């Protein structure tokens, strides 16, 4: 199935039903009083994370999703039925953004997480609500409010422990093939990897971590060169980044310059991502021999001012790969995933009708009663009098 990690959809919550103005009119019950019911609330729109999905492709074809409208109130104090909610299933790791305001509504990072993205309109109030000691026959009501409508940008961000960085042909896909059962395409030309892929690396019988491979970056990616930087978002939730460097590029490019290019593009995309723990790994040491590779790696590290440790591996032959995966596993276990409070602002996400409950009673709609007789007679026919709102 084609990997789609972005989709723009229209979500429309249901409108609230209008309140009803009616009076109880029964024989032998003079002036029975108001009995207009409230309308029903409009339906809401939710997103729910489903671990069985891995792409947003369904939302590329169907763009509009609307919840049900609340029913109008009726006589005899009958409240209108609430509009039907709709729930849209998305892959785990999906972020919802209001495309107009760019407000991040929330992230769905666990299976079964549910999030409100469009709130239904508040129900209108029937005339029963306006009865008081000084207004025994109220002719006021309120109409239901319109449901929220949003242009919603869905972004799928892969959930992985380890993210792979590097130029095209650095050997990222070969590394994933060597440490996991994933089989990304491998070839001797740039941009073999066109979409992100995940692999599960097992260390021993009971330990494992998830590694994400993204298409390689090139100089100018921040301005759209190559495949651009759109896939870097998939590394935002990784705990550690592996910067894989071809120690002796076949195109005779300078590894020092190659490292600088990646760091620059990463920084231009996100300072937060650039500050993540990053390990330097020199690949393809089998092409020049271990001793020459060690000397070359030392010179490169000195030129870029690298202060930490670095690794020399051959993803193709598996040389030193096992030690690297063990060290990665130890790091991950020593640094458990933190529940980043990126969604702290979610508590402050203000939906359109949050204050309507308090304001509705202050602005009622009054019916035009010029055509109706205020005098109630006990001789009237038995039944309920319903006053319908004029078009």
UniProtKB/Swiss-Prot annotation:
Q: What is its EC number?
A: 3.6.5.-
Which UniProt key words apply to this protein? Cytoplasm, GTP-binding, Hydrolase, Magnesium, Metal-binding, Nucleotide-binding
Q: Which residues bind GTP?
A: 166-173, 191-195, 213-216, 283-286, 314-316
Q: What's the superkingdom here?
A: Bacteria
GO cellular component annotations, sorted alphabetically? Answer: cytoplasm
Instruction: State its cofactor.
Output: Mg(2+)
Q: Gene3D superfamilies, alphabetically? A: GTP1/OBG domain, P-loop containing nucleotide triphosphate hydrolases
For binding Mg(2+), which residues are annotated in this chain's numbering? 173, 193
Annotated ranges, domain OBG-type G: 160-333
Keyword Nucleotide-binding in annotation: yes
Q: What is its main location?
A: cytoplasm
- Positions the record marks as coiled coil are none
Any one GO MF term held by the record is: magnesium ion binding
Question: Where is it localised?
Answer: Cytoplasm
Record domain Obg: where: 1-159
SUPFAM superfamilies named in the record = Obg GTP-binding protein N-terminal domain (SSF82051), P-loop containing nucleoside triphosphate hydrolases (SSF52540)
Tell me which PROSITE patterns the record gives: G_OBG, GTP1_OBG, OBG
Q: Which GO terms are recorded in the biological process aspect for this UniProt protein? A: ribosome biogenesis
Task: Keyword check for Hydrolase, yes or no.
Answer: yes
Subunit details: Monomer.
What's the stated role of this polypeptide?
An essential GTPase which binds GTP, GDP and possibly (p)ppGpp with moderate affinity, with high nucleotide exchange rates and a fairly low GTP hydrolysis rate. Plays a role in control of the cell cycle, stress response, ribosome biogenesis and in those bacteria that undergo differentiation, in morphogenesis control.
HAMAP family for the chain: GTPase_Obg (MF_01454)
Homology family: Belongs to the TRAFAC class OBG-HflX-like GTPase superfamily. OBG GTPase family.
Q: What is this protein called?
A: GTPase Obg
């Amino acid at each position: 199935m084609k990997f789609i990690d972005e989709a723009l959809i229209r979500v429309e919550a249901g409108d609230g039903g209008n309140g009803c103005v009616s009076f109880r009119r029964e024989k032998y019950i003079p002036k029975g009083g108001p009995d207009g019911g409230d309308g029903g609330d409009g339906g809401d729109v939710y997103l729910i994370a489903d671990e069985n999905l891995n792409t947003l492709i369904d939302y590329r074809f169907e763009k509009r999703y609307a919840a049900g409208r609340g029913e109008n109130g009726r006589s005899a104090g009958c409240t209108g039925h609430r509009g039907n909610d709709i729930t849209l299933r998305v892959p785990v790791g999906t972020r919802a953004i209001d495309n107009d305001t760019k407000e991040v509504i929330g992230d769905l990072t666990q299976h079964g997480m549910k999030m409100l993205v469009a709130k239904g309109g508040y129900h209108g109030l029937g005339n029963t609500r306006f009865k008081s000691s000084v207004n025994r026959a109220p002719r006021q009501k309120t109409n239901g409010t319109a449901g929220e409508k949003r242009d919603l940008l869905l972004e799928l961000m892969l959930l992985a422990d380890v993210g792979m960085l590097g130029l095209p042909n650095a050997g990222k896909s070969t590394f994933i093939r060597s440490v996991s059962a994933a089989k990304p395409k491998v070839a001797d030309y740039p941009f073999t990897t066109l979409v992100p892929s995940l692999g599960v690396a097992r260390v021993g019988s009971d330990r494992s971590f998830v590694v994400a491979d993204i298409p390689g970056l090139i100089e100018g990616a921040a301005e759209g060169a190559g495949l651009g930087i759109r896939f870097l978002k998939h590394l935002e939730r990784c705990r550690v980044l592996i910067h894989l460097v071809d120690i002796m590029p076949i195109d005779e490019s300078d590894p020092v310059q190659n490292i600088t290019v990646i760091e620059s593009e990463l920084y231009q995309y996100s300072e937060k991502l650039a500050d993540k723990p990053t390990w330097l790994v020199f690949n393809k040491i089998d092409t020049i021999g271990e001793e020459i590779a060690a000397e070359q790696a030392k010179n490169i590290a000195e030129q870029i001012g690298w202060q930490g440790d670095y690794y020399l591996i051959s993803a193709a032959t598996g040389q030193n790969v096992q030690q690297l995966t063990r060290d990665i596993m130890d790091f991950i276990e020593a640094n458990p995933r933190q529940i980043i409070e990126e969604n702290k602002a979610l508590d402050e996400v203000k939906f359109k009708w949050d204050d309507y409950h308090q304001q509705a009673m202050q602005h009622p709609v009054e019916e035009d009663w010029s055509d109706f007789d205020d005098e109630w007679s006990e001789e009237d026919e038995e039944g309920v009098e319903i006053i319908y709102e004029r078009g």
